Amino acid sequence: MGPFIVIAVVVAAGVIVGLLVANKNNKLFESGAAYRNRPADFYTQMHTFRTTVPNLELLLNALDGRTLAQQGITVIRDHADRLVFRDAMDRFTATLTALPEDPSLGEGISFYRFTVNRVKTKNGTIILSARMGINVALTAVEKAFLTLDFNAVAQRVYMTDWKTKTSFF
């Protein structure tokens, strides 16, 4: 009878933790503050933004650093035309890159590309916390663009080359 009680306690604890995490995620989603509902494979897409925002410095200042920090995400400018998003647990790396200007597309129009460069998986499947972190980072980028340019346009294209970091435990 003893092992059954231990198993029941472990299962009950797992269910309680799962419900608490789901409740926290639902509150974040309903508030719209941290992340948005997206397709399950959104992290395999390249997100391109067409905007009048002229440089990454303005965008970096418009990012919601508080929400990113609460989710353990840091943003660094590692190059003049690139921001790197990483989480504290090394579950993903994403970049926002300013693309070269193309005068044929119009004066004052800039393009930026958000891509996930690496994501941690477990048994070949992306871990939920990595997907959540990527979603939070992408939502912060979208909100920053819309804050600076209400007419910013986003497009998504599936990528064929993205890397995972496999974990067995």
Please report, for each region that a protein language model flagged, where it lies by residue.
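Cytosol-/stroma-facing membrane-proximal "stalk/adaptor" domains immediately downstream
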Residues: L83-F169
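Feature marks short, highly hydrophobic, charge-poor N-terminal signal-anchor/signal peptide-like helices
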Residues: M1-V10
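Terminal, regulation- and interaction-focused segments at domain boundaries
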Residues: G14-Q71
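A generic structural signal for short, non-catalytic loop/turn and secondary-structure boundary residues
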Residues: F42, D78, L105-E107
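Extracytoplasmic/periplasmic/luminal assembly and interaction segments
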Residues: N61-A88
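Generic low-complexity segments that are intrinsically disordered, proline-rich and/or Lys/Arg-biased
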Residues: F4, A40, N55, E101-S104
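Residues that act as N-cap/strand-start positions at coil-to-secondary-structure junctions
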Residues: Y43-Q45, H79, D90
